[in-house]
Amino acid sequence: MALARQSLSPGTLVGAYQLAEVIGKGGFSLIYLAHDLDTGAEVVIKEYMPKKLARRRDGGRVVPMSAEQALSLHHGRRLFFQEVQALASLSHPSIVRVLDFFLANDTGYLVMPNERGRNLSGYLQQRRGGVSTTFLLDVFVPVLDALALMHRHAMVHLDVKPGNIHLRHGNQPLLLDLGAVHPLNRERARGSQVVTAGYSPVEQYFSRAELGPWTDVYAVGASIRTCMERKTPPPALERKKEDTLVSAREALAGRYPGFLLEAVDWAMQMEAARRPRDASALLDWLRPHLDRYRTGAVTSAADSRPTGVEAH
């Protein structure tokens, strides 16, 4: 009998790991807390289980929802392995380490360390006021640096948002949801499009649109603005119809340094060609402003405006 997208029961053995509990569910995966039976370490396991394509059979096997979806499920599973293999080759303090990946139950599993800390989205919900400039720089400069490494290796994350940023001790950030990461030179599987309202730019809503590092840049800008205002920006499709979003440099003037507001506005340009081409471009533009900010010589908004961002 095929069941709906049911999680595996606590105590289930998958490879060399014993599952403890489900700790998350996404559009394409189930996430478990588990124990490594060889080392005793606590780990996090992501199971490839796209809710629009897959069902669970008795015994734990993952099968397509219908015969028509078999090819898409197979293709998605193959891409899952290719993408995890690519990520395993990257080493960065803000990119989660891949400990293991394997095939079981006719699907793929990704094993990661269980990092202690808190989720940025949850942290924002608990705060009564906005966050400081220092906090934003501590979190998002390393995130941009991690994305820059991915972009240099022709990979894009495609789902950067506060809910996918984990804060460790000292607010050291860790990018989560590696299952959304996609190599630029590979075709996207049907049903694999990730869209998060408020953080996904307009090109991400259309299957034939070209995605690239600039797609991640928009999401970073939207995430920073969420931290500043404690609310999610309007969805890109709404902005495409009628852009009522007031620029950050106008809406938040005096609350944050001009250079940071300009960076947010540049990153959140509706047209991809008007954004920084990748995370490195935005980071390179930010660096001299960061140096001046840390020494107390903060530039004004007018002086710091990047090319392509118009004053309103």
What label would you give each PLM region?
Residues A20-G26, I31:
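Protein kinase glycine-rich loop
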Residues D58-S89:
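AlphaC helix of the eukaryotic protein kinase fold
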Residues F101:
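Activation-segment/catalytic-loop signature of the eukaryotic protein kinase fold
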Residues N105-N119:
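Conserved short submotifs of the Hanks-type protein kinase catalytic core
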Residues L120-V131:
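AlphaC helix of the protein kinase catalytic domain
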Residues V139-F140:
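Activation segment signature within eukaryotic-like protein kinase domains
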Residues V143-M155:
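Protein kinase catalytic-loop region centered on the HRD/HxD motif
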Residues G198-R294:
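C-terminal lobe helix-coil module of Hanks-type protein kinase domains
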